[in-house]
C-alpha cells in the first residue's frame, strides 16, 4: 500500500516533467541527426562521431568541412566511363597504359575500386550508375547503357566483361546489354561465379574477386 502511494505521487510528476534536450544541446542534436543520415550510421554511432569531432582541434573540423564541401561541389563524372573523377577524364581512362579495347561493365564506382584492388584487370571501365530494377523505377534509359552501346560500336572494342552483381536485377541487366551489343563485338564475357549469389562486388574479398575476373567465362555459356 505504501509503495502504491509513492508511485501514485511520482507518476503525475513524471507526466508533467519537462526535461532537457536529449543531447543537452540543440547543436549536438542537429549534428547527430545529419550524421545518422549516412548509410549504416545509427544515432549512437553518429553521436560518437560528433563527440570525436568536438574533441579534436578546430583544424580537423575545418578540414573535414572543406573536404565535404569540395567533394559535393567540385567532383565530376568521367565523360568516357562515368566513373567519379576530378577532371573530364578519370585517371584510368587517361592512362594510355591501360587496355582501352577491353571494357569492364560495373554498377557503380565502388565496384571499380574493388576490382582495382585486385590488380587483376588492366582494361578500362564503364559505370552504369545502377542496374535495371522496375520495382525502383530504373529502366535502361535511366542508366548509361546507351553510351556503352555507342562506345562498343564506335571504338572497335575487342572484349566486354559484364561484372554486375549476381542478383536478379544484375542478371537482367547483363542479358539486356548482351542483346544490345552482341552484334558489335564477338567477345562478351562475365566474371566467374566466385562471388556468391546476391553478393555485391565491393563486399567480395580481393582474392575471390580477382579469380572471378581472371577465370571469366563467355556470357553465352552462362545462359
Language model features: what each stretch is:
Residues 22-29, 37, 49-112:
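Cys/His-rich Zn2+-binding cysteine-cluster or related metal-binding knuckle/ribbon modules and their
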Residues 29-33, 47-51, 62, 66, ...:
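Solvent-exposed alpha-helical segments within well-ordered globular domains of core cellular machineries
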Residues 86, 97-98, 109-112, 131-134, ...:
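Conserved nucleotide-binding/hydrolysis micro-motifs of P-loop NTPases
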Residues 102-161:
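Long, charge-rich boundary regions
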Residues 149-223:
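Long C-terminal interaction/binding lobes of large macromolecular proteins
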